[in-house]
Amino acid sequence: MRVALVNPNRIKPPISPLGLEYVAEGLLAAGHEVNILDLCWEEQPEKAIPAFFNGREYGLVGLSIRNTDDCSFATRESFLPGFSSIVEVIRKHSGAPIVAGGVGFSVMPEAVMAITGVDAGVVGDGEFTLTAIADRCRRQASWEDLPNLVLHRNGSFRRNPVSTVPLFRMPPMSRTLVDNRRYYLEGGQAGIETKRGCPMGCVYCADPLAKGSAIRLRPPEDVVAELGRLLSQGIEHVHICDSEFNVPEDHALEICGEIIRGGLGDRLHWFAYCKPGSFSWELAGQMRRSGCRGINFGADSGDEGMLGRLGRDFAPSEILSAARLCRENGIAVMFDLLLGAPGETRESIARTIELMGRSGADRLGVTVGVRVYPGTRLSKEVQREDLRKGLVGGSDLRDPVFFLEPGIAPTVFDQLDALVGNDPRFLFFDPDRPDRNYNYNANQVLVRAIREGHRGAYWDILRRVHDKRVTRPS
């Protein structure tokens, strides 16, 4: 059966639709014909959609939703109205059922369905569920009983039971179904997964909702074979998209060892997200030897009390240790900070900035205001009467909801300016300092740097651009 897959993500710098590509591989392995409409490259989607659908009959349309908004407290830009317009145009040119999926969809499926009007949605792994839907459609059989689906029912929504599949059952990934080379040249990197799921208890995080709380591992040889296919296309900078690459550590070590055995470590430049807690010397060394150039640690705070409130299970001392181990192994370090959760004070912010300032990190990304996703522990906590006044947004389903501790809200940006001063390592929203912009969406400094040939994780590109400018002879 012929299936259309649509990527509606048009943010710049462009990010390759990894999930959509994996879904396409699953459909092809099951014998379906797949055509991909990548709207990232279309200046006029309203014309590209009819040109794609007219003259072709499709039995199923898949819509991949990676992000529902820009996740920025300062801008709060929702992408859902644009997705809704895309669905509306598709409907005019195809009568096939439209099924949404992707990480962004899986976090808030009912809201996305209500706004976009898609027929159904897949929560979690699309490779298996969308393929099962296509198999049923090919036989003209009902598919509404399949697991992981969200369906319209009597003016409301119904979620089918969740089912997960071991990732060793994923088909081989050719990495040729989207234009990864163009994404690399215009977006600076490619993505890959070595696992799915996150068992951590962070109060704000939606990853367990989208990917499950149980970790499922990909065989290291499959991951390295996929990396080899990217390298064969001239793609040398890769971001590992796992929630936390070093959880569990033994699998991370196996991945590094397989890269080294495959002889890819000297050609590959890769970046990852990691947890600061229990980050070991052995892993730091193996990551560097296998080509790791930078790690983004989700530190969140340097204050012990706030770490506990955020559900983090490591101490400030472990943050410092992780940075030291990376420095000693030649790995660039980024710490992501999340300020403004319930209980945040001026004092906890000061302790955080002080700790980060002496951590030796290469860059420190400061997010002020916490995105509140439905279904997280934070979403329940902020419904308390004393916390509701800290909520920002949520005027309707299209408006992203954030929380900012009311006690710090009037002064937090002034305090950050005073604490950080001119330290270039800190990235945070400052309308008077575009070089500090930590919103990657439509970041013109970043877009220009990639156009000039910079590659890698976006925080590291911004670091290198700044450092090059500072050291350039006058």
Predicted regions located by residue number:
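Acidic, low-complexity intrinsically disordered segments
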Residues: 1-233
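Radical SAM enzyme core and accessory elements
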Residues: 2-8, 50-60, 376-383, 387-474
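Acidic-and-aromatic substrate-binding clefts and catalytic sites of carbohydrate-active enzymes
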Residues: 12, 39-47, 246-250, 276-280, ...
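Short helix-capping segments at alpha-helix termini
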Residues: 31-32, 91-96, 141, 260-267, ...
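Conserved strand-turn element in the central/C-terminal portion of the radical SAM core barrel
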Residues: 39, 274-275, 302-311, 323-348, ...
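Non-cysteine beta-strand/loop elements that form the S-adenosyl-L-methionine
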Residues: 62-65, 126, 284-302, 364-370
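Catalytic cores of alpha/beta
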Residues: 109-115, 283, 343-358
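Radical SAM [4Fe-4S] cluster-binding motif and immediate context
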Residues: 171-334, 350, 354
